[in-house]
Amino acid sequence: MCAVKATLVVRHRITYGEELFSEVVVWVVPQPIAGCTHAYKYRLALVAHGECVLRYDNEAGKGDHRHAGSGEGKYRFSTLDILFADFE
């Protein structure tokens, strides 16, 4: 039996300055991540001075969620385009 692997959709890092960058990584997965109903595994992060100040991700078990500063809350995923717009 052959395992189906995830397919990379995008991996992009933008440096805005010496201490500021954003990183976007999205995969299409063969089955939804635990806690999600869609076929994506993603991480979108904004990092300033070595600290993540904003992140959208869907780690297994937690499902779709958003980190802003020290806070964390649920995120309602609908499409990649809306996710990207929300991250902007």
Indicate residue ranges for each PLM-predicted region:
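Short, compact, well-ordered microdomains
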Residues: 71-88
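A short small-residue
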Residues: 66-70
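The feature represents the first ordered module of a protein
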Residues: 2-65
